[in-house]
């Protein structure tokens, strides 16, 4: 099957050369041959363009080389304002078509995002934001834009996950990386499967959702009575191997099982926390109190005042304030990130309504953090 893929790619290259030479019939013939050999998205997209718009002569698109690459032998995609009609009669430009073909031609996740192999989180986020806005199906109606958008999302989902990225780099199988076949299965190692759909990933970046850690009121295990939980999506990987696969899965799950057992044992060995930042009827922590220093409200049970006095009470109130400040700091970070992303999207789309919405965000947690900071300095 992979031999057919190579032959199909050669046919697509011949078709592009024919288009550049103005030979529409030859290009169409080789694209149809490529379709029979292997279902390449680039061949299908080019064939649709020929059938709808005739010859698309010009420089053939190619993957964006990562920064630092010395290869300058390939021509850049030409700018062209020629427009066509996509699905549902919506228009698209030749630039958009070239961009879609460029993405679909990329052979690994790094080429899809246009980053180097040592790119950090910020580089990946910057590259994803730029490409996701450019190729989102609501904005780009060129043939194959949806597949390109999915490919971008899958590439980011893999490279932004340290474990998947490590597994992806170790295989060395970049030729087939991040290409999704028509039968709905990836044709390479399972480490390149995304745990989140491209649309959900887009909503996280531009819809206000942030999968960051959230501080909950107290799990014990240290003197401060606070614990931060990091929520992560977990994907269900497809079973591809038989035989001793069950034993391999068991070995892989052993660290997780050990962690769960240790966590359960630690919970059994730790006493209930003496306070909560929110009323909790289940533990009887419904009596409202306030710290002496910052005036932070917290809730205790009916026996608290008898058990905690003097220095013990001061230690508890110090823990209350530390947990409260941590909570406010995390929420302030989320507010700032949301505002930054909205401003970026408004700039890209030139959307005044979105810009006004970003400017109108109340930033309540950030204001509270400033108030607490001034109290600390004043104290």
UniProtKB/Swiss-Prot annotation:
One of its GO terms (cellular component) is endoplasmic reticulum membrane. It comes from the Eukaryota. Gene3D superfamilies: DnaJ domain. Residues 266-379 are lumenal. PROSITE patterns: DNAJ_1 (PS00636), DNAJ_2 (PS50076). Residues 69-84 have a biased composition (Polar residues). It is found in: Endoplasmic reticulum membrane; Nucleus membrane. The chain crosses the membrane at residues 245-265. Residues 1-244 are cytoplasmic. It is a single-pass membrane protein. One of its GO terms (biological process) is cellular response to misfolded protein. InterPro entries: DnaJ_domain, DnaJ_domain_CS, DnaJ_subfamily_B/C, DUF1977_DnaJ-like, J_dom_sf. Keywords: Chaperone, Endoplasmic reticulum, Membrane, Nucleus, Transmembrane, Transmembrane helix. Residues 55-93, 219-241 are annotated as: Disordered. SMART domains: DnaJ. Residues 108-172 form the J domain. GO terms for molecular function: Hsp70 protein binding. Acts as a co-chaperone with HSPA8/Hsc70; required to promote protein folding and trafficking, prevent aggregation of client proteins, and promote unfolded proteins to endoplasmic reticulum-associated degradation (ERAD) pathway. Acts by determining HSPA8/Hsc70's ATPase and polypeptide-binding activities. Can also act independently of HSPA8/Hsc70: together with DNAJB12, acts as a chaperone that promotes maturation of potassium channels KCND2 and KCNH2 by stabilizing nascent channel subunits and assembling them into tetramers. Belongs to the DnaJ family. DNAJB12/DNAJB14 subfamily. Interacts (via J domain) with HSPA8/Hsc70. Forms a multiprotein complex, at least composed of DNAJB12, DNAJB14, HSPA8/Hsc70 and SGTA; interaction with DNAJB14 and HSPA8/Hsc70 is direct. This is DnaJ homolog subfamily B member 14. The gene is DNAJB14.
